[in-house]
Amino acid sequence: MVANSTVANTQPKRLSIGIIGGGIGGVAFAVALSRDSQLDVQLFEAAPQFSEIGAGVSFGPNAVKAIQLLGLENAYQRIADSSPAPFEDVWFEWRRGSDDTYLTASLAPGVGQSSVHRADFLDAIVANLPEGIAHFGKRCIGVKQGTDSATASFDDGTHFTGDVIIGFDGIKSAVRPHVLPPEQYGEITPFWSGTYAYRGMIPTRDLEIALEAKGSEKRLALVPQMYLGKDRHILTFPVKQSQLVNVVAFITDRSIPNPKLPEGEEWVQAVSQAEMLDVFAGWSPACQAILECIPEPTRWALHELPELARYQRDRVLIMGEAAHALVPHQGAGAGQALEDAYVLATLLADASCRSHNVSTVLSAFEQVRHSRTCKVQRTSHEAGDVYEYAGEGIGDDEAELINNLESRFEWLWNHDPHEDVIAAKNSLKFETSENWG
């Protein structure tokens, strides 16, 4: 905790960078930047300590590639789960939710379903963060900027002034209104997707016993599964070195366009097991076994952001969920945050990037990332429709559904974020050839 009224640099550096938000993306970004001694990096987190929800998060091949490029592969592999032999390449097996009938599998060769417990992953990243970078109890309440600097203000009366402010502060971002002023872009707020997600964690052995008692295969506990049905689907995958199984059961209201969350309803609530079981009444034996093992589920109202017109305003940029929050149906949210972190950290670490041209660098980042992140938002929402027999041109046609599931992730997974870096640097060399460096 910094005691004085302003967080200031103590030694001259090539760039001073303030990061708002200490989630997985923000901390990974800070770790990557901290390896360059010419960068002054300060991270501000509203909470009194780093913390993440106790849930699983899955990564596709593109996200695993970003983790490697960020230099976090060893930390990740120590805690990551993967599909057991002979299912190493399976991302998910897809089944009919009414009777457990196997439909197909989505394969990610060499990676399969790579997953971790969120809190464990954040802890592993934090272990690589040098002391003195993180500041806690720093809730951002506003951002402003001048010609040669940007300033973030916090609710404890302190401020940070630097060359760059990066908002990695989530779907309820305090930095976003500065980047997209309401008077120019209208009020941009998260909207309910129409989907509730019931979450729970089950000890793996308990689920294996429950599955066998229902006449189902116990391997369904260890191989990632997706059970599909009309307006509903359930996913499972192992975490904590296969000690636990992460479960998320989704239900979507498609009765009206753009459904609204009841006024005043909390986004996350503890609910009864009976409510959850009622939602999935009549589903398969395996699904009943899974849900009966969750005595105290939580229900999440899944929110997302519209596709934003821009992510940057001069020296201020938003990334991760602050810029492109999405529903989790492609397991892509954390991966996009990590891609963002790698691409921008690499650009800012280039010796040619300095205070006088950093706005141009942020603009180049936006140019190479905007269309991809918007497409991930859009297709993540569409994926939920596909899984719940509501996909456009697919519906409940299982032959079309299978074709879609076997190919829909290739463009997402077969992406190397270093190509974004190359494209951005090529753009910068062209646009700033007279004054770069």
What are these regions (language model features)?
Residues 2-17, 46, 50-53, 57, ...:
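Conserved N-terminal glycine/acidic-rich loop preference
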Residues 16, 40, 244:
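Residues at the starts of beta-strands that form the adenosine-phosphate
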Residues 3-15, 87, 93-94, 100, ...:
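C-terminal helical "tail/cap" subdomain of flavin- and related membrane-associated enzymes
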Residues 111-112, 116, 122-294:
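Conserved FAD-binding catalytic core of PHBH/FMO-like flavoproteins
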